[in-house]
C-alpha cells in the first residue's frame, strides 16, 4: 500500500512563489496603468532653460495622432513626493483620452538636484521644472494646442501658479485650464493688487477643509483666520469673482460646487471651488480629488472618451502596487531562508523550528513592561525634543533632506535608547536566568559577522532589484497612498549611504530588542499575537501624535503647538504603518537567522532607501520651519 506523500512548503518554493506573485502584481499594475495597452507610457527627460534635467513620464493614448489630436494635462506633485505618487490621476485621465505628463520637480525623484539659488530664485528653472514639461507637451504633434491644462497638489499648486505666470510672460501662452488641489490660487498681482492673473483660463480649486498648510488667511487688522473659514474670506470671494477687489463686491456668497462664469476676451470662463472634508495629504490617495480633476478637465476640454469622474479603477492599480511591495519583501525573506540552508551560510542558520521562548517569571514580566513602556514613552519625548530644538526643519550641505533628517534623528535616538533598555534587561534579568550574549546571537565570530553582512546585502539587493525592474520595465513604483518604495537614479545613491548609519542603528537596535531581548512570549499567546503586539507598540507613538494633532486641529482650526512644535503631528502620519511593517519583517527574517544583525541591517537599509528616494533634496544650510 502506497503512503500518501505530505506536501512540504520549502524556502525555495516560497521564493519561487514570491517571485511569481510579485511579477503578476507588477504586470497587473502596468496593465491597469496603461488601460490594458491602450495608453503608451514612457519616461524621458526635458531640460529647463537653466540647463537642468527634469524626469517626466508621458501617458499617450494610442488613438491620439497628428490627425486626431488629444487634450493634454501636466500634473505637478507636492513637496517631498514624486510623479509616481500621483499615478492615479494620470491613469484616470489617460484612459479617458487625455495625454498626461507627470514630471518630477527639480530636486525630487529622478530629476537633477540643483543648488538653492536655482531651485528657489532662478526664473530659468521653469517653476521647479514644471513649465519645462508644459513646453514639452506643447511640441507634441498629437496634442491639441488649444487644450492644454495644468494641475498641481500642494507645492505642485505653487509650481502651477508659477507656470501660469511664465506662460503669461511667454508671449505665446499655451495653458488654457488650471486646477489647484489643496493649494492657494494667486489672488493678487506682483504689485499686491487684487487681480485675475489667470485671464481667460478655466480655473478650479479643490479646497481641503482640514488643511494645515494652505487656505488660512488674515483679517484686515492682521488676525489669523483658519482654513476652515476660507469660503468666507476675501480671497475666496475675489477668486469666484474673477479677481475683483473684494471691497467692491456686495452680497457675494461663495458656494462650493457652484460654477461661476464670466466672458473674458470673448471666451466663456469658469471658476469653481470644490469643498472636501479632508486633510492636506488626502488628495495624494483619495477618490474625491481624482473625480474633481477628471470632471473639471472633461468640462473644460473636449473629452475623447467621456466618463464621469466618480467612475474610477485606480484603486485596483494601487492594490496591485502595494501587493507587489509585500511580494518584494517576501522575496527578501525567502532569499534569506534559502541561502541559510546552503553550506556557505549554514553557520547563520537558525535552529530548526525556532520558537519564542516561554514567558518570563514575575520579575521578568515587570522588567519587560517597564522597559517596553519606557521605549514607547521615549519615542514621544525624543520627537518632541527634535522639533522643539528646530532639528526637524533644517538641511545642511551634508544632510540635504529636511524630511529625512527628522526620521534619521528620531531613528538614531530611539535606536540608542533601545540598545540601552535591551542590554539593561540583560544585566538586570536575562543573564540571571542563564542567558548569554552568545545565546542572544549578539556575540558572534568575526567570520560569521562578515557572512551576516554579505547575507544582509543580498537580502537588501533582492528588494531593490525588484524596485528597479518595476520602474524601468513596468513604469511603476510599489506603494499605497503615502507609503511605498521606488528606485533611485544611480547618481543619487550617495544620499542613501549618507543617511544609512542613522537607520542601521535603529534597525539593529530594534532587532536586538525584539529578536533577542524580548524574543519570548508575554503570556500564553500564539506567536502571531506576540508579533502583532510589538508591531502595535512601535506604531503607538506615531499614531497617537497624528491622531491628537489632527483632532485638535479639526476642533480649533489652528495647528496645536504640542509635541515640540505646531507641525510635529503632520510628519508622523508617514510613520504610522512603516514601523509595524518593519517589526513584522524583522520577526519573519529572524525565523531563519541565528543573530539579530541580518534582520536589523536589512530593515534599516530598506527604511533608509524608502525614505531618501522620494523627498526634496537641497545641499545648503536652510531652516524650513
Regions found by a protein language model. Give the residues of each.
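Short, Lys/Arg-rich N-terminal segment immediately upstream of the first membrane anchor
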Residues: 1-11, 355-363
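Alpha-helical transmembrane segments of integral membrane proteins
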Residues: 2, 369-625
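An N-terminal hydrophobic leader/cap segment in hydrolases
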Residues: 6-47, 55-57
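Hydrophobic H-region at the start of alpha-helical membrane spans
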Residues: 11-21, 324-328, 371-374, 413-417
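Structural signature of transmembrane alpha-helix termini at the membrane-water interface
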Residues: 27-31, 333-343, 469, 548, ...
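Soluble extramembrane regions of membrane proteins in the secretory/endomembrane system
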Residues: 38-313
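Juxtamembrane/start-of-transmembrane alpha-helix segments at the extracytoplasmic/lumenal side
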Residues: 311-325
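Juxtamembrane interface at the cytosolic side of transmembrane helices
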Residues: 326-373
Amino acid at each position: 500500500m502506497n503512503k500518501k506523500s505530505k506536501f512540504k512548503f520549502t524556502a525555495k518554493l516560497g521564493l519561487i512563489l514570491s517571485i511569481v506573485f510579485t511579477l503578476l502584481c507588477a504586470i497587473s499594475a502596468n496593465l491597469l496603468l496603461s488601460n490594458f495597452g491602450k495608453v503608451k507610457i514612457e519616461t524621458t527627460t526635458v531640460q529647463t532653460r537653466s540647463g537642468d534635467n527634469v524626469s517626466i513620464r508621458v501617458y499617450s493614448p494610442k488613438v491620439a495622432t497628428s490627425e486626431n489630436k488629444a487634450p493634454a494635462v501636466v500634473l505637478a506633485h507636492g513637496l517631498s513626493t514624486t510623479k509616481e505618487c500621483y499615478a492615479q490621476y494620470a491613469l484616470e485621465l489617460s484612459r479617458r483620452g487625455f495625454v498626461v505628463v507627470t514630471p518630477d520637480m527639480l530636486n525630487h525623484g529622478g530629476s537633477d538636484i540643483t543648488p538653492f539659488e536655482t531651485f528657489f530664485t532662478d526664473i530659468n528653472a521653469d517653476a521647479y521644472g514644471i513649465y519645462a514639461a508644459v513646453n514639452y507637451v506643447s511640441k507634441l504633434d498629437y496634442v491639441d494646442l488649444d487644450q492644454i491644462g495644468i494641475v498641481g497638489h500642494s507645492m505642485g499648486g505653487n509650481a502651477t501658479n508659477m507656470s501660469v505666470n511664465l506662460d503669461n510672460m511667454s508671449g505665446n501662452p499655451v495653458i488654457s485650464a488650471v486646477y489647484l488641489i489643496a493649494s492657494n490660487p494667486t489672488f493678487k498681482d506682483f504689485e499686491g493688487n487684487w487681480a485675475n492673473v489667470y485671464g481667460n483660463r478655466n480655473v478650479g480649486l479643490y479646497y481641503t477643509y482640514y488643511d494645515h498648510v494652505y487656505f488660512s488667511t488674515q483679517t484686515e487688522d492682521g488676525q489669523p483666520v483658519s482654513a476652515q473659514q476660507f469660503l468666507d474670506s476675501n480671497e475666496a470671494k475675489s477668486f469666484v469673482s474673477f479677481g475683483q477687489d473684494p471691497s467692491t463686491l456686495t452680497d457675494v456668497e461663495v458656494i462650493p460646487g457652484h460654477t461661476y462664469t464670466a466672458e473674458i476676451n470673448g471666451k466663456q470662463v469658469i471658476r469653481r471651488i470644490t469643498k472636501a472634508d479632508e486633510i492636506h495629504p488626502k488628495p495624494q490617495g483619495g477618490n474625491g480629488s481624482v473625480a474633481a480633476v477628471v470632471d473639471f478637465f472633461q468640462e473644460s476640454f473636449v473629452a475623447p472618451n467621456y466618463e464621469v469622474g466618480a467612475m474610477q479603477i485606480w484603486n485596483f492599480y494601487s492594490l496591485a502596487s502595494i501587493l507587489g511591495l509585500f511580494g518584494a519583501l517576501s522575496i527578501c525573506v525567502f532569499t534569506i531562508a534559502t541561502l541559510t540552508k546552503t553550506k556557505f551560510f549554514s553557520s547563520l542558520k537558525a535552529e530548526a523550528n525556532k520558537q519564542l521562548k516561554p514567558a518570563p517569571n514575575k520579575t521578568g514580566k515587570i522588567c519587560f513592561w517597564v522597559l517596553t513602556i519606557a521605549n514607547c514613552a521615549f519615542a514621544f519625548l525624543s520627537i518632541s525634543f527634535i522639533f522643539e530644538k528646530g532639528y526637524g526643519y533644517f538641511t545642511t550641505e551634508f544632510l540635504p533632506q529636511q524630511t529625512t533628517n527628522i526620521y534619521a534623528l528620531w531613528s538614531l535616538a530611539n535606536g540608542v535608547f533601545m540598545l540601552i533598555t535591551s542590554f539593561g534587561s540583560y544585566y538586570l534579568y536575562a543573564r540571571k536566568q542563564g542567558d548569554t550574549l552568545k545565546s542572544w546571537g549578539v556575540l558572534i565570530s568575526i567570520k560569521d559577522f562578515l557572512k551576516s553582512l554579505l547575507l544582509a546585502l543580498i537580502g537588501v539587493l533582492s528588494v531593490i532589484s525588484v524596485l528597479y525592474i518595476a520602474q524601468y520595465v513596468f513604469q511603476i513604483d510599489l506603494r499605497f497612498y503615502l507609503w511605498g518604495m521606488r528606485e533611485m537614479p544611480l547618481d543619487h545613491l550617495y544620499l542613501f549611504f549618507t543617511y544609512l548609519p542613522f537607520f542601521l542603528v535603529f534597525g539593529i537596535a530594534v532587532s536586538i530588542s525584539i529578536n533577542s531581548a524580548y524574543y519570548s512570549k508575554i503570556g500564553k499567546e500564539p506567536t502571531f499575537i506576540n508579533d502583532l503586539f510589538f508591531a502595535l507598540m512601535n506604531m503607538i507613538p506615531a499614531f497617537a501624535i497624528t491622531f491628537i494633532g489632527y483632532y485638535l486641529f479639526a476642533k480649533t482650526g489652528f495647528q496645536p503647538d504640542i509635541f515640540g512644535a505646531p507641525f510635529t503631528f503632520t510628519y508622523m502620519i508617514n510613520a504610522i504603518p512603516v514601523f509595524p511593517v518593519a517589526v513584522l519583517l524583522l520577526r519573519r527574517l529572524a525565523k531563519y537567522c541565528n543573530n539579530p544583525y541580518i534582520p536589523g541591517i536589512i530593515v534599516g537599509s530598506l527604511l533608509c532607501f524608502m525614505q531618501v528616494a522620494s523627498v526634496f533634496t537641497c545641499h545648503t544650510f536652510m531652516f524650513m520651519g
